[in-house]
Amino acid sequence: MFKRETKDFINIDPLQTGGKLTEEARQALLEWGDGYSVCDFCTTGRLDEIKTPPIHDFIHNQLPKFLGCDVARVTNGAREAKFAVMHSLAKKDAWVVMDENCHYSSYVAAERAGLNIALVPKTDYPDYAITPENFAQTIEETKKRGEVVLALITYPDGNYGNLPDVKKIAKVCSEYDVPLLVNGAYAIGRMPVSLKEIGADFIVGSGHKSMAASGPIGVMGMKEEWAEIVLRRSEKYKNKEVELLGCTARGATIITLMASFPHVRERIKRWDEEVEKARRFAAEMEKLGIKQLGDNPHNHDLMFFHAEVLYEISKKAKGGRFFLYRELKSRKIHGIKPGLTRYFKLSTYGLSDEEVDYVLNAFKEIIEKYS
């Protein structure tokens, strides 16, 4: 019942390529996987103050340095981090401006926080880019409708893997006196990212998507000036931070995040290799008639493809639109959702050159088989 069929497959699912556990994390999971075992020696009622295991050092020393921020916390996911920021800044009839490529959880978090939402439009096919100019125009127009208490940029987005010019967007937001939150769920842990270098106010990441941790867990960083607002304390339970509901990621999630952290800290230094690998993959897919959409040349391992050749095959092949999933599965390749043939996304993060070639050859074989 609990056997995972795809465990030993080549995994190209963007949700999972950056979240594969390290061997150190697997060992820590066995050691600390029982319930709240990390709370064995909690004396203050605060997760971030636990010193055995060294959670305090991780959250207050290592994580801020890694994120390039003043203050950091762990959350139960990037979406919970986004909501914490939005809810703490929300006012009656206020607005949040976010890019049209945003993850659905960004939009839902804003709705839950009671904020009005203005979307920065993306450019047309095939780039789907978010530009600083469109960001400025949307903020300008939205300010006429009410107070803009926050802006959010997705870096990169989870559809196309586009990396917008986040520094210019941060400058735009600063000029309009609007704090900026960077959703780096597919960036932090894969590539070098620094809140201070970007010039934004908040940054959130995903441990299970991009930091080799069990899910769900997120990270949140901010400038010192926002800590008093976002991390305000309960009136009755003086040690509890309200937006975090006291404590967040307890148990297997925090311990695997910490155990993988030394590896994650090192792997981001090899980001250029991951980009080159993705570009090589995209170029070879183009030779098969499968077009890579979004930034081109691409700057991230998450890629979105338009495959008319596969779509045409699906009209005639046995199994219809599920033929591609089944063909890849038979070759022990996992990650493209069942039923997708015309448009799909994938990630080459962490794959060896041999695995990349194997996946490319699989697509070539499939197309030749049905031609």
From Swiss-Prot:
It catalyses: O-phospho-L-seryl-tRNA(Cys) + hydrogen sulfide + H(+) = L-cysteinyl-tRNA(Cys) + phosphate. InterPro entries: PyrdxlP-dep_Trfase, PyrdxlP-dep_Trfase_major, PyrdxlP-dep_Trfase_small, Sep_Cys-tRNA_synth_arc, SepSecS/SepCysS. Pyridoxal 5'-phosphate binds at residues 78-79, 183, 206-208. GO terms for molecular function: Sep-tRNA:Cys-tRNA synthase activity. It is an enzyme of class 2 (transferase). The modification N6-(pyridoxal phosphate)lysine is found at residue 209. One of its GO terms (biological process) is translation. Keywords: Protein biosynthesis, Pyridoxal phosphate, Transferase. Its cofactor is pyridoxal 5'-phosphate. PANTHER family: CYSTEINE DESULFURASE, O-PHOSPHO-L-SERYL-TRNA:CYS-TRNA SYNTHASE. Converts O-phospho-L-seryl-tRNA(Cys) (Sep-tRNA(Cys)) to L-cysteinyl-tRNA(Cys) (Cys-tRNA(Cys)). Homodimer. Probably interacts with SepRS. Belongs to the SepCysS family. This is O-phospho-L-seryl-tRNA:Cys-tRNA synthase 1. It comes from Archaeoglobus fulgidus (strain ATCC 49558 / DSM 4304 / JCM 9628 / NBRC 100126 / VC-16). The lineage of its organism: Archaea, Methanobacteriati, Methanobacteriota, Archaeoglobi, Archaeoglobales.
